[in-house]
């Protein structure tokens, strides 16, 4: 790093080298701001999808389950077949 700085001082002089260093810091600052804007946009995108897709999807799935599979059948003969004939957790007991 010092070798590069010494070479620039020899070839360009102190004023131009200082200007190059200043431009490099400005470029790093602008790069940081661009990355910050990108992260903020990605965060807003994730929040949008979570708010408008994930949460309503989970609520809709819960609603459908409660009003279809989660309901009691009120048919005891069918419930006994379901309980007795199908394996529990994938294993017959």
UniProtKB/Swiss-Prot annotation:
GO biological process per UniProt: disruption of cellular anatomical structure in another organism; viral budding from Golgi membrane
Superkingdom assignment: Viruses
Record-linked InterPro entries: E_protein_CoV, IBV_3C
Primary subcellular site in the record, as a coarse category: host cell
Localization of this protein: Host Golgi apparatus membrane
Stretches assigned to the Virion surface side: 1-11
Alphabetically ordered keywords of this record: Apoptosis, Host Golgi apparatus, Host membrane, Membrane, Transmembrane, Transmembrane helix
Membrane topology (UniProt): Single-pass type III membrane protein
Cellular component aspect of the GO annotation: host cell Golgi membrane; membrane
Segments traversing the membrane: 12-32
Ranges in the topological domain labelled Intravirion: 33-93
Summary of subunit composition and partner proteins: Homooligomer. Interacts with the M membrane protein in the budding compartment of the host cell, which is located between endoplasmic reticulum and the Golgi complex. The cytoplasmic tails of both proteins are important for this function. Interacts with Nucleoprotein.
Family per similarity comment: Belongs to the gammacoronaviruses E protein family.
Record's function text: Plays a central role in virus morphogenesis and assembly. Acts as a viroporin and self-assembles in host membranes forming pentameric protein-lipid pores that allow ion transport. Also plays a role in the induction of apoptosis.
Protein name (database record): Envelope small membrane protein
Source organism per UniProt: Avian infectious bronchitis virus (strain Portugal/322/82) (IBV)
Lineage: Viruses, Riboviria, Orthornavirae, Pisuviricota, Pisoniviricetes
Gene: E
